[in-house]
């Protein structure tokens, strides 16, 4: 197999982005929210560093939700995601609700939060796609998100992304 300098660069970028995502993972437990809008607000706080940043993330998540609902009925979770200018990498987190949120016909146990840098690189999309496919295909991943510790979530995401990395080498 012939490997070019470009291939090495792409593989290195993938590795850097995987490491960055793994370092950013956050799992937060919340006692109660009364609406999807409130859940989105909590999600916007997860990776914020200022009030302006909270507003920007919240606006983008609401904007995305208005395009089409991000509720995954088979999993009883929201998949809150957006592109944002105030970060330069990807972020992944989970908000676990102690009390199920009931809104309209939805029963929501929690929300995955995925932020991708605006002007995102293909590698960001590839990483998030790998995680999202695992949500659908691997029941164990959902169980870990909903019930286990943050370090267990990090370990599972690492396992998923190491497989992606191995396939690319």
Task: List each model region and its residues.
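Cytosolic covalent-transfer regions centered on His/Cys nucleophiles
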Residues: 1-169
């Amino acid at each position: 197999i012939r490997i070019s300098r470009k291939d090495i660069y792409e593989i290195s970028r993938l590795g850097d982005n995987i490491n960055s995502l793994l370092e950013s993972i956050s799992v937060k437990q919340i006692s109660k929210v009364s609406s999807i809008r409130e859940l989105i607000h909590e999600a916007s706080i997860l990776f914020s560093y200022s009030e302006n940043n909270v507003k920007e993330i919240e606006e983008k998540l609401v904007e995305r939700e208005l395009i089409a609902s991000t509720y995954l009925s088979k999993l009883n979770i929201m998949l809150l995601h957006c592109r944002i200018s105030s970060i330069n990498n990807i972020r992944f987190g989970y908000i676990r609700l102690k009390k199920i949120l009931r809104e309209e016909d939805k029963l929501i146990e929690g929300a995955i939060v995925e932020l991708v840098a605006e002007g995102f690189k293909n590698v960001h999309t590839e990483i998030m796609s790998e995680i999202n496919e695992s949500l659908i295909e691997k029941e164990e991943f959902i169980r870990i998100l909903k019930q286990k510790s943050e370090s267990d979530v990090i370990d599972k995401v690492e396992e998923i992304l190491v497989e992606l990395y191995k396939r690319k080498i």
